[in-house]
């Protein structure tokens, strides 16, 4: 039993090393409000450290975040020339679940910075957030392991949410859920099979709306201007979608009345089957990311950290 648990722990550890986990760079409530430029540099340092461990941290919304709280321990103005500011700060780094309000990993780093102004002093102090630092590597690894463990335990609920969303024709939400499960997690294979299913449903559902818009533009103005507006909609019809035949029929109808150099039938969107599958997955992920960002709170401040 102990050996099995140890093996499972090792498996998660290895998976964490090879697995890309997406984190949202969040703002923590600070004792002293940081200027936007300083906050941006702090976010960039966090993103670089995470990237060094094979993952991604950016502004895209995910349930999981990385952030840093800053406690200024010492501040002094140094006489020049030039006059400068010296700081000693305590940086406390966190990786956690914003939705569940749970911290997965934390690390405190003491840092010093000197600059020609207070902002430069902070920015120089942030150099302590270095992906080559073994303690920071361990902090990120621990956070990733716990995120993987969370997905392994909760992927069923995620797939249920995806299924429920799809049943209500909320295919962008369904794609958000199924594309959120990392490749290294036990639910990924099951989720990946649903990506193509939900993407096809998304395309077919939306192509009916696209056809309505295209027909409306052509009906309102059956001339070159209306043809141009209709074609602007038709180009969004995916090859292989349930509306492809209708789109070609409308295209041919327009071409009979309006002479132009448009080429709808011969668009080379996909070179081969492998390219099609890859492009569909990328498109599905983009749809999911866009939906997730739409669900993002008005503020990304993490106010519950202590």
Enumerate the language-model features and the residues they cover.
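N-terminal segment of the mature soluble domain
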Residues: 17-69
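Bacterial Sec-dependent N-terminal signal peptides
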Residues: 1-20
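Short, well-structured alpha-helical interface segments that form or flank functional binding sites
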Residues: 60-65, 88, 157, 173-176
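Amphipathic beta-strand/beta-sheet edge segments enriched in Tyr/Trp
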Residues: 67-118
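C-terminal/domain-edge helix-coil "capping" segments
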Residues: 103, 107-213, 219-229, 239, ...
């Amino acid at each position: 039993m102990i050996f099995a648990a140890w093996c499972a722990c090792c498996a998660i550890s290895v998976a964490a090393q090879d697995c890309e986990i997406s984190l949202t760079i969040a703002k923590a409530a600070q004792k002293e409000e940081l200027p936007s430029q300083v906050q941006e540099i702090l976010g960039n340092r966090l993103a670089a450290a995470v990237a060094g461990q094979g993952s991604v941290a950016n502004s895209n919304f995910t349930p999981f975040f990385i952030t840093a709280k800053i406690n200024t321990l010492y501040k002094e103005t140094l006489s020049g020339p030039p006059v400068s500011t010296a700081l000693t700060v305590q940086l406390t780094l966190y990786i956690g679940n914003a939705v569940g309000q749970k911290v997965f990993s934390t690390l405190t780093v003491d840092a010093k910075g000197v600059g020609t102004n207070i902002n430069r002093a902070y920015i120089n102090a942030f150099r302590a957030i270095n992906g080559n630092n073994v303690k920071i590597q361990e902090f990120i690894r621990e956070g990733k392991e716990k995120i993987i463990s969370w997905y392994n335990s909760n992927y069923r609920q995620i797939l249920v949410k995806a299924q429920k969303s799809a049943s209500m024709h909320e295919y962008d939400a369904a794609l958000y859920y199924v594309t959120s499960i990392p490749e290294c997690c036990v639910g990924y294979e099951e989720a990946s099979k649903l990506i193509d299913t939900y993407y096809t449903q998304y395309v077919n559902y939306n192509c009916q709306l696209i056809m309505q818009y295209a027909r409306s533009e052509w009906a309102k103005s059956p001339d070159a201007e209306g043809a141009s507006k209709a074609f602007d909609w038709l180009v969004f019809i995916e090859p292989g979608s349930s509306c492809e035949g209708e789109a070609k029929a409308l295209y041919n109808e327009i071409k009979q009345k309006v002479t132009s150099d448009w080429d709808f039938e011969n668009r080379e969107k996909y070179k081969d089957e492998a390219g099609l599958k890859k492009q569909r997955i990328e498109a599905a992920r983009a749809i999911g990311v866009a939906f997730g960002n739409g669900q993002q709170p008005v503020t990304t401040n993490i106010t519950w950290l202590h």
